[in-house]
């Protein structure tokens, strides 16, 4: 009885660990397809109020330029005193 119980528990542990390993391998195949921009860089841009501008999007480029110049102004004013 004890031996069959131990074998059943061992079988369950091995089957769950092998399925978890298989799922991990599948996740690694998906990762290269994720966005090229790192999460950290993206969150910093959002924090600073800067957005990604597509090619030829003049309005977006103006907004980004104003945001960057405003941040530069704040930074230089802080260091003058």
Curated annotation (Swiss-Prot):
Belongs to the phytosulfokine family. GO terms for cellular component: extracellular region. It comes from the Eukaryota. It is found in: Secreted. Residues 1-20 form the signal peptide. Residues 21-72, 78-81 form a propeptide. This is Putative phytosulfokines 6. It comes from Arabidopsis thaliana (Mouse-ear cress).
């Amino acid at each position: 009885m004890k031996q069959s119980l131990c074998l059943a528990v061992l079988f369950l542990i091995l089957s769950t660990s092998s399925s978890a390993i298989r799922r991990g391998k599948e996740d690694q195949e998906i990762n290269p397809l994720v966005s090229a921009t790192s999460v950290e860089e993206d969150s910093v841009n959002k924090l600073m109020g800067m957005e990604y501008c597509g090619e030829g999007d003049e309005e977006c480029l103006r907004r980004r330029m104003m945001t960057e110049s405003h941040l530069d102004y704040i930074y230089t004013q802080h260091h003058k005193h």
